[in-house]
């Protein structure tokens, strides 16, 4: 789940609601990305020990006895880290998931380049191009790639997800389970149960769960003057430097945009927003925003609950009390951001 909020704030808002602590559990730092050396160190932790590196705790087994870790690791602290580091993580995951396994056969109607392609059972792909020479391609169980698609790896396509007719993937892209994606996608991460099913460009971007991108919508990922792109931070309450020339859209869970929506480079959309209207909306759209370039108002929490319930029920998922409590907690904790923009 991505709520755009940086890890510390995210944990404070809902982490303990959905994942209460249990004795004997191994606790991993949110946003910690694995490598073989780190995995070995974590597996060696004993009850009561905590693995640390400098000021960062990485993992613990219900204790605070500090064990120093001096090896390499990556820790996601900003949303742009997610797509920036995705290429390397795709290759790590591909090696881990395919070790000792045999891919299902690739239908003869496809054009195939490179060897790093793996299909799980039930994958449906015909009359498409699979090029793994620049990155691996992993297609999970029950996923589907419609004819005419061109895949330039890396790509990880989640179980029961679909790439629509003529989809173009430019690499370093992850699509979670039960999602539909189409158009042009470059270096983006789409969480599960989200749709960008139509033409339009999504690049250097992150979409949370239960998002929907209307047909013909696009995001810019490069400023016309080629300057560094800044991105709004909930922690600093300002637009922070990313050090990136390419940075597109970051959209949190349960948010949606209408057809032909255009997002400027470095746009952050909070939780449960509904964006529509001609022109570019502002670069930070607070959680529970309703509107677009012509103006924004606060989206009713009650209506947000009803919409989330409808959306999840379409995928046979229950919008239970825990999910409701999380959305309510985010609504309360982000009120200050709407207040500063005239929404509340």
Please tell me what each predicted stretch does.
Residues 24, 64-68, 101, 105, ...:
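Generic, low-specificity signal for short hydrophobic/alpha-helical stretches with a mild N-terminal bias
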Residues 101-208, 223-224, 250, 268:
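Extended beta-solenoid/beta-helix repeat architectures
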Residues 22-23, 48, 158, 252, ...:
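A general structural motif
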Residues 14-16, 149, 199, 243-244:
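A generic local structural motif
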Residues 165-166, 172, 178-343:
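Glycine-rich hexapeptide-repeat left-handed beta-helix
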Residues 1-116, 122, 278-283, 287-344:
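Terminal amphipathic alpha-helical/low-complexity segments used for targeting or macromolecular assembly
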């Amino acid at each position: 789940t991505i709520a755009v909020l940086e890890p510390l704030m995210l944990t404070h808002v809902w982490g303990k609601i959905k994942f209460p602590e249990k004795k004997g559990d191994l606790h991993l730092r949110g946003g910690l990305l694995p490598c073989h050396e780190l995995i070995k160190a974590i597996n060696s932790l004993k009850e009561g020990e905590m693995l640390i590196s400098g000021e960062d705790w990485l993992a613990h087994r219900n204790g605070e006895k500090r064990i120093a870790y001096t090896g390499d690791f990556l820790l996601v602290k900003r949303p742009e880290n997610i797509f920036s580091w995705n290429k390397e993580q795709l290759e790590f995951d591909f090696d881990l998931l395919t070790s000792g396994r045999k891919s299902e056969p690739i239908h003869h109607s496809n054009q195939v380049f490179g060897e790093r392609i793996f299909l799980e059972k039930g994958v449906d792909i015909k009359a498409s191009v699979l090029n793994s020479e620049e990155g691996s391609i992993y297609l999970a169980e029950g996923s589907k790639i419609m004819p005419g698609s061109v895949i330039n790896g890396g790509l990880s396509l989640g179980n029961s997800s679909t790439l629509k007719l003529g989809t173009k993937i430019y690499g370093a892209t992850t699509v979670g389970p039960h999602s539909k994606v189409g158009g042009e996608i470059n270096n983006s991460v789409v969480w599960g149960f989200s749709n960008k099913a139509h033409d339009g460009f999504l690049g250097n971007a992150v979409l949370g769960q239960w998002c929907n991108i209307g047909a013909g919508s696009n995001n810019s990922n490069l400023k016309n003057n080629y300057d560094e792109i800044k991105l709004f931070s909930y922690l600093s309450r300002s637009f922070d430097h990313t050090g990136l020339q390419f940075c597109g859209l970051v959209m949190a869970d349960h948010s949606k945009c209408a057809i032909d929506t255009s997002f400027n480079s470095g746009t952050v959309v909070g939780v449960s927003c509904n964006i529509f209207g001609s022109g570019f909306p502002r670069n930070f759209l607070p959680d529970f925003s309703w509107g677009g370039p012509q103006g924004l108002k606060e989206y009713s929490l009650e209506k947000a609950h009803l919409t989330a319930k409808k959306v999840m029920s379409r995928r046979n998922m229950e919008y239970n009390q825990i999910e409701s409590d999380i959305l309510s907690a985010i609504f309360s904790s982000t009120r200050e951001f709407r207040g500063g923009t005239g929404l509340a």
